[in-house]
């Protein structure tokens, strides 16, 4: 009995061409997505600055997301503190106002 390996399936030129085309499309889509990501993350975009590598792009994006999450958390804490101060001032203001009766 003849053993059929994976390489036999790739022997047909049409199959190999189809696989190659699919891989080229996949890589094109990946590179386009990375270019889109590079366009929105903050880094030097000057003409003399080299394009970021794939890994550098992903790491920079990850760090940017972490920084944004921390900023949101800090702002949320500040908003809570300001709300409490505002409520305290309103209560103080109410307690200092003479009754209208």
From Swiss-Prot:
<keyword id="KW-0238">DNA-binding</keyword>
<feature type="domain" description="bHLH">
    <location>
        <begin position="14"/>
        <end position="68"/>
    </location>
</feature>
<dbReference type="GO" id="GO:0005634">
    <property type="term" value="C:nucleus"/>
</dbReference>
<protein>
    <recommendedName>
        <fullName>Helix-loop-helix protein 17</fullName>
    </recommendedName>
</protein>
<dbReference type="GO" id="GO:0000981">
    <property type="term" value="F:DNA-binding transcription factor activity, RNA polymerase II-specific"/>
</dbReference>
<keyword id="KW-0805">Transcription regulation</keyword>
<dbReference type="Pfam" id="PF00010">
    <property type="entry name" value="HLH"/>
</dbReference>
<feature type="region of interest" description="Helix-loop-helix motif">
    <location>
        <begin position="28"/>
        <end position="68"/>
    </location>
</feature>
<dbReference type="GO" id="GO:0061564">
    <property type="term" value="P:axon development"/>
</dbReference>
<dbReference type="GO" id="GO:0032226">
    <property type="term" value="P:positive regulation of synaptic transmission, dopaminergic"/>
</dbReference>
<comment type="function">
    <text>Probable transcription factor that regulates the expression of dopamine receptors dop-1, dop-2 and dop-3 and thus dopamine-dependent behaviors. May act redundantly with hlh-31 and hlh-32 to regulate ventral CEPsh glia functions. May play a role in chemotactic responses in larvae.</text>
</comment>
<dbReference type="InterPro" id="IPR011598">
    <property type="entry name" value="bHLH_dom"/>
</dbReference>
<dbReference type="GO" id="GO:0007423">
    <property type="term" value="P:sensory organ development"/>
</dbReference>
<dbReference type="GO" id="GO:0046983">
    <property type="term" value="F:protein dimerization activity"/>
</dbReference>
<dbReference type="InterPro" id="IPR050359">
    <property type="entry name" value="bHLH_transcription_factors"/>
</dbReference>
<feature type="region of interest" description="Basic motif">
    <location>
        <begin position="14"/>
        <end position="27"/>
    </location>
</feature>
<dbReference type="GO" id="GO:0070888">
    <property type="term" value="F:E-box binding"/>
</dbReference>
<dbReference type="InterPro" id="IPR036638">
    <property type="entry name" value="HLH_DNA-bd_sf"/>
</dbReference>
<keyword id="KW-0804">Transcription</keyword>
<keyword id="KW-0539">Nucleus</keyword>
<dbReference type="GO" id="GO:0045944">
    <property type="term" value="P:positive regulation of transcription by RNA polymerase II"/>
</dbReference>
């Amino acid at each position: 009995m003849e053993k059929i390996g994976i390489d036999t399936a790739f022997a047909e030129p049409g199959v190999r061409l189809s696989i190659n085309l699919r891989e080229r499309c996949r890589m094109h889509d990946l590179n386009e997505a990375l270019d889109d990501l590079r366009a929105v993350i903050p880094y030097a975009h000057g003409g003399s600055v080299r394009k970021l590598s794939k890994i550098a792009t992903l790491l920079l994006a990850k760090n940017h997301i972490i920084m944004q999450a921390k900023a949101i958390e800090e702002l949320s804490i500040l908003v809570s503190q300001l709300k409490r101060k505002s409520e305290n001032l309103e209560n103080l203001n109410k307690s200092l106002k003479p009754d209208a009766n």
